[in-house]
Amino acid sequence: MKKEEYLEKVALANLWMRAYYEKDEPLASDEEYDALIRELRAFEEQNKDEISKDSPTQKIAPTIQSEFKKIAHLKRMWSMEDVFDESEFRAWAKRAKCEKNFFIEPKFDGASLNLLYENGKLVSGATRGDGEVGEDITLNVFEIENIPKNIAYKERIEIRGEVVILKDDFEKINEKRALLNQSLFANPRNAASGSLRQLDTSITKERNLKFYPWGLGENTLNFTKHSEVMQFIRELGFLKDDFVRLCVNLDEVLKAYDELLALREKKPMMMDGMVVRIDDLALCEELGYTVKFPKFMAAFKFPALEKTTRLIGVNLQVGRSGVITPVAVLEPVNLDGVVVKSATLHNFDEIARLDVKINDFVSVIRSGDVIPKITKVFKERREGLEMEISRPKLCPTCQSELLDEGTLIKCQNIDCEDRLVNSIIHFVSKKCLNIDGLGENIVELLYKHKKITTLESIFHLKFNDFEGLEGFKEKKINNLLNAIEQARECELFRFITALGIEHIGEVAAKKLSLSFGKEWHKQSFEAYANLEGFGEQMALSLCEFTRVNRTRIDEFYKLLNLKIEKLEIKSDGVIFGKTFVITGTLSRSRDEFKALIEKLGGKVSGSVSKKTDYVLFGEEAGSKLIKAKELEIKCIDESAFNELVKE
């Protein structure tokens, strides 16, 4: 890299850093920014006499510019040096001249906060800012419930940590913002930072922020180990994460990194790495600091789950109900070992909200098995080659005219090939008729060869329909035909679910089955609307569907021997009338526990509220368990639940 290119990259890095810190509006993904900083460092290591004083490697953050007052930290708040793989980690340890006794904990992806206590009382809260001076957000800090306002320690002390938003709360915040037609937060970190810097404290309060401590600033304590410091902080009443380790050597640190990385998706809050810190405080003091970092600690970063790429096109998919879903075609990008080439755009209202165009640079996130999605459009990086994404007029599959309802655009042709295929795939899926061996690819193959063309045709398949088809041998054919025969004996609620009626899912299907039996499709609007949990929209959907398909449903009854499960509810037990929430990994499926609770007269809810009576938790329980403890709801493990059931 030449000096001119280096200076250009310094300017670009500063532009990205100011957008991130001052406006909470990133112009690049973390992965892009980290890569740029590493380029600068590589040049600077080889050209120490040409290092620009403006380089982001030489400072913590831009000067603060905001409506909040400034507040000086009593001791500087440092950033951490990033390491990205084993070799970089071992190189850091070698520079620190330490290969034993490390304190490690998760690196939460949130906003850093400095709390000042005097005479046992919280007197101020400030953002990191430039490390020396932050923003005075004291009023907002008082709205964070899990920050103690009084502590059992009278000396002046600065307690530092990370403010985060739990993943579930983040989704709720964005759902609410979407309804209000407000711009969505790109990620929980931006949401946490934005929530701390609200002029209206009531907004901060409703965001349900959490504070996790990670260290001290000013203090007069005499501990010799950082692990003792953290134990002291937690005894003052601060939240502790479950994953904290003392590692005796480098290999143990690497093992802990792998363990924490495996928990990444299951943690209730976002993590972007693991903090590794020398536990011996005397050695930390001896090592000291660089211009920007402490030499005794590092952030061992996880592989990026969010990256920047270019949107190069849009494909249209037709669902079983006829709804057209736009899917972004992306320049391939590797996200945590998976090559991502597409991302959902949900609907055309979402395209308008994002103001995304073909050839835009976009930020794409992938989380677990969730379909990749676009979280941000970098409009400032447009080059004049971008093209609008127009709303379609014709179905991409059958070319029939589409019905544009605003948010949803639908194909109304019931013979549209994509609609039929997706309806069949849904009909045979696990939560519906659960026909083992009849997966998506097999359905598409059978439809292509006209072996199945309707839902009913599944039950007319014969051995010779499969002969000559690729991959089908005698054993496989017989297994599939046996699975189809077994599906004839399914429960009525599964059949209702399988029909794919708009607004009618598994829970509603069970209610219909138990309330009306096989006559469920011959009821009035009033009968549907009066069911517990049903409303006008569901009743209208049922009336319209059954009006059109009543005869067809009766014909299905001739093909199937549907069973109606009678739910015998025990009304004299301790569970009767109680509401449960189930979270974490248990020895049996959630459906099994749900069925047992309902049989004993209880109810199972999907979210924790003040109306919840019990939270049944298993291993790696997440945000629901945290919220339950905050609301002082009774939390029981599987063993306690089994004892409760016996009573």
Curated annotation (Swiss-Prot):
InterPro entries: BRCT_dom, BRCT_dom_sf, DisA/LigA_HHH, DNA_ligase, DNA_ligase_AS, DNA_ligase_CS, DNAligase_adenylation, DNAligase_N. It catalyses: NAD(+) + (deoxyribonucleotide)n-3'-hydroxyl + 5'-phospho-(deoxyribonucleotide)m = (deoxyribonucleotide)n+m + AMP + beta-nicotinamide D-nucleotide. NAD(+) binds at D30, E31, E32, Y33, D34, S79, M80, E105, R128, E162, K301. GO terms for biological process: DNA repair; DNA replication. One of its GO terms (molecular function) is metal ion binding. Signal peptide: none annotated. This is DNA ligase. GO terms for cellular component: cytosol. DNA ligase that catalyzes the formation of phosphodiester linkages between 5'-phosphoryl and 3'-hydroxyl groups in double-stranded DNA using NAD as a coenzyme and as the energy source for the reaction. It is essential for DNA replication and repair of damaged DNA. Zn(2+) binds at C395, C398, C411, C416. Coiled coil: none annotated. CDD domains: BRCT_DNA_ligase_like, LIGANc. Belongs to the NAD-dependent DNA ligase family. LigA subfamily. The keyword DNA repair applies. Keywords: DNA damage, DNA repair, DNA replication, Ligase, Magnesium, Manganese, Metal-binding, NAD, Zinc. Residues 570-647 form the BRCT domain. It is an enzyme of class 6 (ligase). The active site is at K107. Its EC number is 6.5.1.2. Its cofactor is Mg(2+); Mn(2+).
